[in-house]
Regions:
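Pre-Walker A adenine-sensing motif
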Residues: 1-13
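The conserved Walker
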Residues: 24-25, 89
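Conserved lysine of the Walker
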Residues: 29
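Conserved nucleotide-sensing/catalytic segment adjacent to the nucleotide-binding pocket
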Residues: 55-110
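Short, amphipathic alpha-helical "recognition" segments used to contact nucleic acids or chromatin
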Residues: 221-239, 266
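Short coil turns linking two alpha-helices in DNA-binding domains
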Residues: 240, 251-253
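Short alpha-helical "recognition helix" segments of helix-turn-helix
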Residues: 243-248
């Protein structure tokens, strides 16, 4: 496939390619990423082993390759918006990853991010040099493929349109078509079972976090008399001062003022 060839070329010349695969939910973004990884690694299990929902697992792989003085041909950050969403750009872990992304080439030759829309951090998305839009094979595309001697079932195949993104000397975006890939939605059953289990675990974890957050908001709304304690509890749970202000329904200045007061009292 076109994208696989670009990744191989990048690896050989010690370059770096970053890819944003986007499209509606369930259209086949992960299927495309896995097919690309399979072409790169030649093994479905190895391909899946290089797909990550959890950033910690991906960072652990980077550290292992760095210790060995090697570079990873390809990793996949699936549903990257779960932890790299622009809606929470101020969190420290996201800022740290963006800074690491500037030097990622030392340990990684290419990375694919999948997301339903362009909801990644702006600083990160501006540095991604390939965009891939996943689309259904409609009547017009089907006829085009037939003219090129390609016959596929539109129900089980998708088209991945590849665009190169760069900036002009005036920092204006330049979009250039690089080609397209036609690929099947399906892959081996045992790989799908493994992937589905990983995804269910991630969904379960996310639901627990949402439930905990909702319960916290209910408790906060029911009792604002002990607001200093609530601020400290949320701070210990890893929430930023801006997030605490939103959760408690108070201004950021109030959060800073109360924390400063608590600090003075403890001295």
């Amino acid at each position: 496939m076109v994208l696989s060839n670009l990744i191989r070329e990048s690896y050989k010349r010690e370059g770096f390619i970053s890819v944003l695969v986007f499209g509606s939910q369930g259209i086949g973004k992960t299927s495309y990423a896995l097919h690309i990884a399979h072409e790169i690694y030649g093994d479905w299990n190895i391909a899946l082993n290089h797909l990550f929902f959890n950033p910690r697992d991906m960072i652990s792989l980077f550290k292992r390759y760095l210790r060995n003085g090697e570079r990873i041909p390809l990793v996949i950050s699936d549903d990257a918006g779960l932890w790299l969403s622009k809606s929470r750009w101020w969190l420290r872990d996201k800022q740290e990853f963006c800074e690491f992304f500037d030097i990622i080439r030392t340990v990684c030759s290419s990375i694919i991010f999948t997301t339903p829309s362009d909801n990644l951090l702006s600083r990160l998305s501006h540095e991604i040099n390939l965009r891939v839009k996943i689309s259904y094979i409609d009547g017009e595309i089907y006829e085009m493929l037939k003219r090129e001697g390609i016959s596929v079932n539109p129900q089980t195949y998708r088209i991945a349109k590849i665009y190169q993104f760069s900036l002009s000397p005036l920092f204006q975006p330049i979009i250039k078509k690089r080609g397209y890939d036609i690929y099947p939605l399906y892959y081996p059953d045992e790989i799908k079972e493994r992937y589905d289990k990983i995804r269910r675990d991630i969904v379960r974890l996310k639901l627990e976090r949402v439930d905990t957050s909702l319960k916290s908001q209910i408790e906060i709304k029911c009792d604002k008399t002990n607001i200093d304690q609530k601020i400290l509890e949320l701070l210990s749970q890893g929430y930023s001062k801006s997030e605490i202000a939103r959760l408690l329904g108070i201004g950021r200045a109030t959060v800073y003022r109360r924390l400063r007061k608590l600090s003075q009292m403890s001295q």
